[in-house]
Each structure stands twice: as C-alpha cells, then as structure tokens.
Amino acid sequence: SKLGYKPDMKAISKETIHISDLSRSAHKGERGSILCLGGSKSMEGAGILAGISALRSGGGKIFWASNTDKLQRPPELIHIDPTIDSIKAAIDKNMSTAIIGPGLGRNFDKEIEFLWNSKLNIVLDADGLDWLSRKKPKKRAAAWVGTPHIGEMQKLLKDDFSDKWSNITKLKKHYGGDWILKGPGTLVSEDSKIWLNLYSNGWLGTAGMGDVLAGIIAGLWASGSNTPYRSAVYLQTQCAKNFLRLNNGAGLTASNISELIGPCIGHYFQNEL
C-alpha cells in the first residue's frame, strides 16, 4: 500500500532505539523466557527462525510449542507440546513474552485465545493475525504488537484498507495494541508515535524475514529493551545492510539475518552500528 507520509512521523535511527546491555553476571533466568507458538509440521522453519532469532536477540530460554517431530528440533530450543496445559506450565517459569503465529496453522484457536487472555507481552504474526481477523477478540490489557505484511493488512481491515499511515491508525482503533506494518517504508507504532524505517531493499522481501523479525522483537523485549518494536526493525535493517555490503548487494536470506544479529548487537554497543 502507499505510504501516505505525514510530517509528524519520526525516523528510526540509532539515536531513537534502545537495546538492553546484559550485565556480565546475567544468567538465563534473568534474561526472560519466551514462548514461541508456531512452526507446525511442514512449517517448522518458521518456528525455528523465530525461536533462534529470539535467543540471539537476548532471550534467556525459548519454549517452542509445536507438534513437529524430534528430528526438526534445534537443541537450543526447549520443546513443549502445543497444548494449553503445557503452555500453562511453561508460563510459570519466569516467562514474559510470547511469539504467536509463525508457521502455526489454523488449528490452535483455543491456545491463541488462552495466551491472548494472559498477562504476557505478545508478538502476533502470520496465523496469529489470521486468528485476530477471524475472531475479533476483546482488546487486551497487556502489551502486544501485530506485524502484518500487506496481504495480512488487507485481511484485517477489509474495505478500510488504504495507505500505510491510515492503516496503522485504523488497526490501533479496531484492534488495540501496537503495529509494525512491514514492507518498503515500514511503519511502527510505539510510544504513542508513528515511526518510519527509511531503509528499504527488495532482498528483505523473502520467505522467513517476518519470522526473524518476530523473534528479534521478542528477544529484545524479554531482555529489557524499552523500545523493542523500532529497535527490532532497525536491527534487522542493519543486519541486511552488513550482509549486502559484504556480498555485493545480493543473495540475502532470513537465516543470514538471524546469524548476524549477535554481531550487529555487538556493533551497537561499540557505537559502530
């Protein structure tokens, strides 16, 4: 959709983001546990990308709720069954944040509803956004962010769909929460303002990029960032820039972005990002 630029948009820059610095004595229990409900059979990659990216962005432990088989489970992720009972037990373990939707499928309405009614911070993506458009639940009190691409925006807004500026304000009005509208000219609602990502590159428009972004948001959020939405967008952008600079501007994949999260956070703390 068209951007619909407004003069009171704020540009995302290094000066406007915050990534929490971990103390040398920090342990995994202090860095926040994250639930990832996603990556069902045949879509395991989406859950893995989100979960591993959350770890690389600062999360201490990632509980991956998926019905996938054991051969598809990365050793860094703690696998649990995608049931309300298993999710309840995981939430009791110092959990602060949940990623809902990447590669999930549409057979988990009750589990999504349970998390929606919880006190966890939520990153809602992909099939989680489909649930939102179908069920139209009551607005939640706890913090959450939706991360739609253009097709998901159209499904959420239907006849109200227009330019990005109008879309982000309509989504907040209809559903509550905050929003990251992906694609060229990414818009972010955070701190009661609308933020614009000035960087755009067609290589970011490939499978899995949204899963990585959802993971980055959750990892930064769980580890203490007070601007997790725009910080995640900025960090993903910088990972892409670094890769494309080193590879003559081509061949970027979602896994490349995920692998560069750690180095880019390191550059941030060295004032080189």
Model-derived features: positions:
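Small-residue (G/A/S/T)-rich helix-start motifs and N-terminal tracts that mark the onset
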Residues: S1-N121, D130-V145, I150, Q154-L273
